[in-house]
């Protein structure tokens, strides 16, 4: 249930449509399997496969963007096109020109698409109107951009903006390491990436390695800055903070797993309980992290 990544966004103005209103908007852009000739299709799908495009618990909402893509490697298309071009050359007595090659490639693609395998990828979105958060469970900015574009397409006048803080993650993480003092409520874990600002981009990584304060200060004095830092919030949630303010490898710790209601036996109730727990914990963590980065800066 828990998101593994958090690409963070803020509501720049109050936004409080009901789950039913959001459902109606998403329904206009719902996912449908692609035809045999479509390379890729996207649309909103049910997070619980129960037909509902918005899974709501209280004011918290969970959405799912589904992407279906045909697996048709360019090397396969190019090989078949090359063979087809050789046949055409033999028939007409001269090599096909650029336009003819382009048409051959399009023809080959159309012939191969119906036989190509399809893969589906679901990307989840958590919306917390009360605390003003919208987070996308995507490891890369490119995938998050896809989701954001579909959100803007489906939800009119969505007041969405990136999170801006008063102290950059790089400056803050570097300061925490150089002073050997983590912000209140957080601890630094045994994974760090330090990178030089020079053209060489010289990089030092610590992975599951004890951190030596003097060694870290030496790297920082030499001009390196922290670009990735593994941390734990209140002994409850571990994560990796990056220089772009994306949060990766989010994981609940044992204290949260023990807190989960073990008396819930119904699968739907369990899902709702887990979602509520995740939303509450992440909202608290994000609030504290924002403060640790100097507070939110209004763009």
Swiss-Prot record:
Q: Which GO terms describe its biological process?
A: DNA recombination; regulation of DNA recombination
The UniProt entry lists the main location of this chain as cytoplasm
Presence of the UniProt keyword Cytoplasm in the record: yes
Q: Does the keyword DNA repair apply?
A: no
InterPro entries xref list = RdgC
Q: Which GO terms describe its molecular function?
A: double-stranded DNA binding
What GO cellular-component annotations does this UniProt entry give? Answer: bacterial nucleoid; cytoplasm
The record's Pfam families line, in alphabetical order, gives:
RdgC
Could you list this entry's UniProt keywords, alphabetically sorted.
Cytoplasm, DNA recombination
Localization, per the record, is: Cytoplasm, Nucleoid
In the record, the note on similarity to other proteins reads: Belongs to the RdgC family.
What does this protein's UniProt record list under function? May be involved in recombination.
Question: Which PANTHER family has this protein been placed in?
Answer: RECOMBINATION-ASSOCIATED PROTEIN RDGC
What is this protein's name? Answer: Recombination-associated protein RdgC
- Organism equals Cupriavidus pinatubonensis (strain JMP 134 / LMG 1197)
